[in-house]
Amino acid sequence: MIFVLTLVALCTAIHCPDGEVEVDGACYPSSCVFEDTVCNNHGTCTASVCRCDSGYSLGNQGCYPSICYLASDDVCNGHGKCVESEHGSYECSCDQGYINDYQVCVPEACYTEEGVCFGYGTCIQPTDGSAPYCRCYPANAGEKCTECSSEAVLIDGACVHKSCLTEFVPGETLVCNGLGRCMIMPFPNIHYVCSCYPYDGTFYNNTCIYNGCITEYNLYGITEVCSDRGICAGTRCVCDSGYNGPTCEYKVVDCEPGFVSAQETCYPEACISDESVCGGHGRCIWNNDGAACACNDGFVFYENTCIYASCIVNGIVCPHGTYDASMNPPRCICPTDYIGRNSVCYPSSCVTNSQTNPPQLCHSAGSCDFDTGVCSCNPTNSGPTCEECSSEATLIDGVCQPWSCIDERNPDALSVCSGKGTCIAYSGRDVFDVCYMCSCDSGYETVPGGICVPNSCVTASLIICSNRGTCTDGVCKCNEGYSGALCEWYQCPTGQTFVNNLCVHEECVTSYDDVAQTTSVCGGYGRCVEDDGSYKCSCRSDAKVIDGECVNESCITNSATNEVCSGHGKCNGYNCVCSVGYFGKHCNVKTL
């Protein structure tokens, strides 16, 4: 029996060829088998290679979520495990001594919130088991590269290598001559070069030369700067002694007092700015009365020179920018953190749509401080660029609308001013005191609660249908029991009449034939009480029941016969209301 079982086992065992491995009763190339599975159960083996499922990538450990293979071909760069998060996605769970930095397991010794080795170095992990450390780029130093080395200078919070610095003018140190950025280059050896801003500068002698300083060049590059008679410092030529002009092209001549050498000629000082005559866009005219520039078309005289008119905004030349007269036509050059449109430099931090002209600022929901680049939001908005709704507003059709203008009668379909008006901001006494109210269309009335209602449905006290109905197509549809154009009347049950906002049994109602056709309960001198299923008046002590109503004693002219107002009128309060043809206190005088 034992022999038979052994024979069966030998007959059913699978023997895979060399280079293949048995998995679940089948043979697969060993290159596709990981952790005793085929492609980690997240791919298929094709031509001895795992083709991973969507969202997975092939690495040294097989098919794993792509996010866990970001840094190397090892899962979590060999210092962690790929685990499923509580949200269903995957992430690296790093080993002790390592920190997850955007799904890369970084040694704590190299980690900073600003990046690995502060973003200015490489984390070295020795193979001999010694502690990891930061190898800083030449411009940086310190345990985690957070300091500047002796080869660099701290400028605007960054360590700039001295090879990128220029100081053509004593005391005026510029990064790449103020026209570029200092970039690190890894090959062939780590070094720094200037990357010049397009249209502003050209790389020359390891710095950026302002294009307006270039006086000669050929197919191979720049051959002459500032006419070889000066240096280009920033956006201007600083000429050698004895020369002047925008590119040092003129010799200086001796001039009389009040005159200045320009273009190798003497001109009145009133026409000279930056050593040019009228900015190169006009003629200098002078006589015994003085001197001034006659500017070309499109230019205006401004502080001894001719300025391109489009570059002057509110009386200021290129606010927050630099006027570049070397261009044709001249233009405003904005700093790197500003965006230029129509000679205006807008802070980039405020610009929320650069495709419009002028660009949209602060999502059109606030004002931008051009000096600080900070948005001051309207009361309806909040956030760095006013992109969110404040607690005083809600989002409707992409716009933060103030609650004071929102019709909330239908919570599932909020509307602004009921769709029949415009929400207007009104300023209070304080500049920051702003309130919002609906300005309704013609034929509509503004009602508290952001509601615009047809005039025909609103009472004098701005109540819709007297709070007793709904307004539909300009007509009040009254609730049950009410009537009238504004639902102002209450419909009493049969046998009752509406008197003084109450339903009163008709047996107790007194009517008067006066001009106002007034009514009262029991003549105003009693109350209506039930008596064996019917109703009657119960009078005050100074009144008497006569014909079912309470009559004040001052109106009774014969108590024995219950005569009221001499039989020619009715009592209304303390007075007689005489019938036609009679007058007098007790209606006892007949009209002639």
From Swiss-Prot:
Record has Repeat as a keyword: yes
Matching InterPro entries: EGF-like_Ca-bd_dom, EGF-like_dom, EGF_extracell, Teneurin
Glycosylated position list: 552
Disulfide pattern: 68-82, 76-92, 110-123, 117-134, 136-145, 271-284, 278-293, 295-306, 362-375, 377-386, 457-471, 478-487, 550-565, 555-576, 578-587
GO cellular component: a single term: axoneme
Key words, A-Z: Cell projection, Cilium, Cytoplasm, Cytoskeleton, Disulfide bond, EGF-like domain, Flagellum, Glycoprotein, Repeat, Signal
Molecular function terms from GO: calcium ion binding
Domain EGF-like residues, every copy: 64-104, 106-146, 267-307, 353-387, 453-488, 546-588
Family (UniProt): Belongs to the NOTCH family.
Subunit comment: Interacts with EB1.
Protein name according to UniProt: Neurogenic locus notch homolog protein
Source organism of the structure: Giardia intestinalis (strain ATCC 50803 / WB clone C6) (Giardia lamblia)
Species lineage: Eukaryota, Metamonada, Diplomonadida, Hexamitidae, Giardiinae
